[in-house]
Amino acid sequence: MNIQIFGTKKCNDTKKAERFFKERGIKYQFIDMKEKGMSKGEFNSVAQVNGGLSGMINWDGKDKDLLALIKYTADEDKLEKVLENPTVIKTPVVRNGKASTLGY
């Protein structure tokens, strides 16, 4: 099992997901979205399972200006904006092979 948790160190839901796996003795790999982010392929595979691009975006996030920019950007440019600003993605993203979940 190769479990990956994409999130930020400050996110409470990401901390809950990490604690879930630690308590059960399950090994996982943590990827900090602020430092590394997700590749286009990783993002697309997770988005496919979780409701597409708009399902991956945390519309209740703090940066309302950036969210408005993404909302009104042309569809072909939205993906690039989201990948440039990974803090707008719902966290945690937990991946295990092709299966993935969003949020805790």
Predicted segments with their positions:
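Thiol/selenol-based redox catalytic cores and closely related redox-interacting motifs
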Residues: M33-Y104
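Local sequence-structure signature of Cys/Sec-based thiol-disulfide redox active-site neighborhoods
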Residues: M1-M33
